[in-house]
Amino acid sequence: EEIYDTFCDTRNIGWSKLHDYASFLEDQNDYTKAIEVAENLRWYYSVPDSKVDEYYLGRLYNLLGMLYKAQNKPDKAEKYYLTAIEICEHLVEKNADAYEPALATSYNNAGVFYKEQGQSGKAEKYYLAAIEIMKRLVKKNADAFEPALAASYNNAGAFYYKQGQSDKAEKYYLAAIEIRKRLVEKNADAYESDLAMSYNNAGVFYKKQGQSDKAEKYYLDAIEIRERLVEKNADAYEPDLAGSYNNAGIFYHEHGQLEKAEKYYLAAIEIYERLVEKNADAYEPNLTAVYNNAGTFYYGQNKPDKAEKYYLAAIEIQKRLVEKNADAYEPYLAMSYSAAGVFYDNQGKPKKAEKYYLAAIEIYERLVKKNVDAHEPALATSYYNAGSFYSEHGQSDKAEEYYLDAIGIYERLVEKNADAYEPALATSYLRYYFLKKDKTYLDKVYEIAKRRQDDPRCRYIVEIVEFM
């Protein structure tokens, strides 16, 4: 009764403002408070005499879907996303011109959700449905809908990139860039940030494709824009700039340009540490990612003290984050444990290495029970790492167990997406062959590796097998 009265009192200022307030809280990464406001608003909308328009109800369900996704509560997020779609589809039947934009937004949000949940079939379905609507809307009013079409193209590019479908990924990334460059010519202030994001994504894509010249160009284009934007509004754009610096650090690290790599890693750390002082909840996850990258960098430079410092700093933060929200941050803690395991293994500290390897596996096994599609690839990698560890330390029974666990997962994953997982399966087969000397696995290795000469791991395996 008290809540109902409160909302009746606020009706004079408009419930749309409460929706805007919840959206504002989402932008501030204050998801708990945003959910509280949005759920109260949902309760108000359910009151029989609220007379709320279906359109606003659909908007609210979309927002709740995004909020619960951010809190890593996929069941609730999916429920709200699908309800929003159902409402918007119903509205489109009444008035397509008025409500197709809202339906496209709902489809796009569902695509993002299912991509993150590892449900690629559903993700693709919704991404393409959103694009189909947006392309139709652009023909009617390019100025109004090209920005949204570019966003949908960008999301589709990210989806196909993750699926290992490089031709489609490139097509959509470049389509997004083409639109956004045109938009920047009309209104740089409004669209340069979006163009920088597309440049950054293209850099990541071309790095993965081994096209280093293109990757570097796009990374530096993104940095150039973001540094300019930071001069105008540091609070708004420093987080994006830090992300670009981190990506450039990874790129130059992988290409052996160590001074540049260190420069960009440390620049990213400097920004994120400053941002964490202002808003720890929002930026500590990003800081831990760069700490891990810096740890790997210094490990490669044979500076174990610095490497250990950054690895442990990442773990310390992530353990604290897990205490606040295990669902959201346990995957990242598991990644840090895995990295620490590799570090201590190579430092000749097997007890610490084993501790971190097994801690990573424990988390991933728990995560897989909640969401197989999202976490099985990481679990397979952890099993493989443990197999290699026990093999190197003469514990062949444990090594065999973990290698077979990894192989079992990779064989399942290959059935779903051969392009993405065949190289990892071939590598696992090879390590198992070295352990057991079972020629059946050597034949399997060679069959995959010979066919997958597009992947450097497979090219290396072919050289090894043919040399043998």
Give the ranges of each region predicted by the language model.
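Leucine-rich, hydrophobic repeat-scaffold detector
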Residues: E1-V92, D97-A98, L103-N109, K115-G118, ...
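Flexible helix-coil transition and linker loops at the boundaries of alpha-helical arrays
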Residues: E2-I13, W43-Y56, E89-E100, K135-E146, ...
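Conserved alpha-helical positions within TPR/SEL1-like repeat arrays
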Residues: S16-D27, Y55-A70, I85, P101-K115, ...
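Periodic short-repeat tracts
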Residues: S106, V112, S120, E124, ...
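Terminal, low-structured helical/coil segments at or just beyond the last alpha-helical repeat
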Residues: K444-M468
